[in-house]
Regions:
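Terminal export/targeting leaders at protein ends
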Residues: 1-85
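Membrane-inserting effector segments that mediate pore formation, membrane fusion
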Residues: 77-100
Length: 100
């Protein structure tokens, strides 16, 4: 999938922002950018992105939210809400940082 912001690593950019600023950016993300983040999350869940035991332990805390985030029937607004939830984005970003 082509990046919605050519030349910009969205995950790395969001990871560097403060929590408040990240929430503001996630709130105005385009549909394509949101799909990119959701796809990365799905790849972590499916095991396509190798994760260490400590990363999996961190993700396990957010299991229900991760499954809802990657669900086909989850609305765009709900996905944005889930990504802003405490710790969820950081757990996913930490798991995909070596690949993305």
């Amino acid at each position: 999938m082509a990046s919605p912001l050519p030349g910009v690593n969205l995950m790395a950019l969001l990871k560097q922002l403060s929590d408040a600023l990240r929430a503001d950016v996630i709130e105005v993300l385009s549909k394509e950018a949101l799909e990119e983040l959701t796809e990365a999350t799905l790849n972590v869940i499916l095991g396509n992105i190798p994760s260490s035991p400590e990363q999996l332990r961190s993700l396990r805390r957010h299991k229900q939210d991760l499954l809802e985030l990657t669900g086909a029937k989850t609305s765009e607004a709900r996905r944005k809400e889930l990504l802003q939830k405490g710790g969820l984005f950081r757990s996913v970003a930490h798991a995909v940082e070596n690949v993305w």
